[in-house]
Amino acid sequence: MSRRNAAEKRPVLPDPQFNNRLATMMISRLMKHGKKSTAQRILAQAFGLINERTGGDPIELFETAVKNATPLVEVRARRVGGATYQVPMEVRQERGTAMALRWLVNFSRARNGRSMSQKLAAELMDAANEAGSAVRKREETHKMAEANKAFAHYRY
C-alpha cells in the first residue's frame, strides 16, 4: 500500500448523451482496452432495445435495475487468532453501486449468444423486475451476511 496520502476522489461527470452519472459509470465498466466509444454504443443500443420492448424510459429502468442489484451488506474476511472469520459489514453507497454495476456487466457478458447490447438489455430488464443473475448475487451476499451475523462484533 502507498505511504502517501490517499488519492483524491474525482467527481463523476454525467454522460453527455444521457445526462446521467450512473450511465457514465456503466460505460466505464463496459469499456475494454480503452474503447470508450464502443462501450457508449453498446449502452445506447441496449437503452434503445429497452425502449422498444418496454415502451418506458430506459434511464428509469436502468436506475431501478442498479438499485435492485445493489447490496446493503457484505462479508469480509477478518483473521482473529489463527482463524479467519467472514465478518458481515455494511456497504457504503458508492461501493454498493460499483458492485451492482460490475455484477450487471459480468453477468451480461456471461449470458449466451447474441450481441452485448442485447445481453445487457436483457440483464437490466431482469434486474429491474427483481430477477436475473445480478439480483440473485445480491441475495446470496445478503444470505452470507445473515449466516455470519454471529461474527458481527469483529467488525473493524
Swiss-Prot record:
GO terms for biological process: translation. SUPFAM superfamilies: Ribosomal protein S7. GO terms for cellular component: small ribosomal subunit. Keywords: Ribonucleoprotein, Ribosomal protein, RNA-binding, rRNA-binding, tRNA-binding. Pfam families: Ribosomal_S7 (PF00177). Gene3D superfamilies: Ribosomal protein S7 domain. It comes from the Bacteria. InterPro entries: Ribosomal_uS7, Ribosomal_uS7_bac/org-type, Ribosomal_uS7_CS, Ribosomal_uS7_dom, Ribosomal_uS7_dom_sf. One of the primary rRNA binding proteins, it binds directly to 16S rRNA where it nucleates assembly of the head domain of the 30S subunit. Is located at the subunit interface close to the decoding center, probably blocks exit of the E-site tRNA. This is Small ribosomal subunit protein uS7. The gene is rpsG.
